[in-house]
């Protein structure tokens, strides 16, 4: 059911101006738009229209949520390409001042922003009378532990075999090729950044982040790019390395004993945080993350429960003398 209203049902009225000229007035024109007499349509929500909506939402969302949740939990570790993540807990990257503490123009290679960073980067804008590159709290707090994975092939030969960890291909394509660029010019990166200084908490300048690959230095370093994409929740994981499967005959990580070598550079005790390393594969919906499935199941269950409650109320009071139907 719906109520309809039309401006045609009302006759425009009101005094007209004096003959021979237009009278000066601050009153709006006597039109349907300015006098708020446009046609309107307003739905009347009744049990007959609302209850099916709640049940339909519940019947759609609950199966979708169950499917996503089961798919997420069924991701089998160590099959196919394996993704290595580092995880942090109790780290609030979604804080407003933290999120804004960056200069996107500087990160995009703008020479003027390189030497004169945005004031949003304060108090990590300048140090030792030099501009900080990259500036801001996000860059200053970049994760810098080093993780190395080794396989002990057999107990008789305990010499560990290092697992090849790929550094390239861990950042989003749009970030790598659009949002982050080094300053233009043919000079070396060290020359381009000579008038800047490193962030306060960094052990080395931005042009020396990857000593093994010169093309992975500066603002286009993929570890740096991954860190600069802030997380929405205080417990999060970020992609660290990729372990590629070489062929279909051999598993990516064969059965055996492994050990993880960690070069500890990133303290977490001062914010009561925790660090972890995750090895995982991906499915059609990405990596293991049960949140989306739980959200769908929760919304679907609430909608279905509300539908049942309203159905009971409608059945109990539909014969009431006050109304023949419940209007919501």
Swiss-Prot record:
Region (Required for ATPase and aminophospholipid flippase activity): 2-48
Keyword presence, Phosphoprotein: no
Disordered: annotated segments: 1-28, 102-125
Assigned GO CC terms: apical plasma membrane; early endosome membrane; endoplasmic reticulum; Golgi apparatus; late endosome membrane; membrane; phospholipid-translocating ATPase complex; photoreceptor inner segment
Topology relative to the membrane: Multi-pass membrane protein
Alphabetized UniProt keyword annotations: Acetylation, Cell membrane, Cell projection, Cytoplasmic vesicle, Disulfide bond, Glycoprotein, Golgi apparatus, Lipid transport, Membrane, Transmembrane, Transmembrane helix, Transport
Entry's localization field: Membrane; Golgi apparatus; Cytoplasmic vesicle, Secretory vesicle membrane; Apical cell membrane
Transmembrane segments: 50-70, 293-313
Disulfide bonds listed in the record: 121-135
Domain of life: Eukaryota
Molecular functions (GO terms): aminophospholipid flippase activity; structural molecule activity
Pfam families assigned: CDC50 (PF03381)
Subunit: Component of various P4-ATPase flippase complexes which consists of a catalytic alpha subunit and an accessory beta subunit. Interacts with ATP8A1 to form a flippase complex; this complex forms an intermediate phosphoenzyme. Interacts with ATP8A2 to form a flippase complex. TP8B1:TMEM30A and ATP8B2:TMEM30A flippase complexes have been shown to form intermediate phosphoenzymes in vitro. Interacts with alpha subunits ATP8A1, ATP8B1, ATP8B2, ATP8B4, ATP10A, ATP10B, ATP10D, ATP11A, ATP11B and ATP11C.
Record note on domains: The N-terminal domain seems to play a role in the reaction cycle of the catalytic subunit such as ATP8A2.
Cytoplasmic-side positions: 2-49, 314-328
Protein name: Cell cycle control protein 50A
């Amino acid at each position: 059911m719906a109520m309809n209203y039309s401006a045609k049902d009302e006759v425009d009225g009101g005094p007209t101006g004096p003959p021979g000229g237009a009278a000066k007035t601050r009153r709006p024109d006597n039109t349907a738009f300015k006098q708020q007499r446009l046609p309107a349509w307003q739905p009347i929500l009744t049990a007959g229209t609302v209850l099916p909506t709640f049940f339909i939402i519940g019947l759609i969302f609950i199966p979708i949520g169950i499917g996503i949740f089961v798919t997420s939990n069924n991701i089998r570790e160590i099959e196919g390409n394996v993704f290595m993540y580092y995880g942090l807990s109790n780290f609030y990257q979604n804080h407003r001042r933290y999120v804004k503490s960056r200069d996107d123009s500087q990160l995009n290679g703008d020479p003027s922003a390189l030497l004169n960073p945005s004031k949003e980067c304060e108090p990590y804008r300048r140090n030792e009378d030099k501009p900080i590159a990259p500036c801001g709290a996000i860059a200053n707090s970049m994760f810098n532990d080093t993780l190395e994975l080794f396989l002990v092939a057999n107990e008789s030969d305990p010499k560990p075999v290092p697992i090849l960890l790929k550094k390239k291909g861990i950042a989003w394509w749009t970030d790598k090729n659009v949002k982050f660029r080094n300053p233009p010019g043919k000079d070396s990166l060290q020359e381009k950044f000579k008038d800047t200084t490193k962030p306060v908490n960094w052990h080395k300048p931005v042009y020396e982040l990857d000593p093994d690959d010169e093309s992975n230095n500066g603002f286009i370093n993929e570890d740096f790019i991954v860190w600069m994409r802030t997380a929405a929740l205080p417990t999060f994981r970020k992609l660290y390395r990729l372990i590629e499967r070489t062929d279909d005959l051999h598993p990516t990580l064969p059965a055996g004993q492994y050990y993880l070598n960690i070069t500890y550079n990133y303290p977490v005790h001062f914010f009561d945080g925790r660090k972890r390393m995750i090895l995982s594969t991906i499915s059609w919906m990405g990596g293991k993350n049960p949140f989306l499935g739980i959200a769908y199941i929760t919304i679907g269950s609430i909608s279905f429960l509300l539908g049942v409650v309203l159905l009971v109320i409608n059945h109990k009071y539909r014969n009431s003398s006050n109304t023949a139907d419940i209007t919501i």
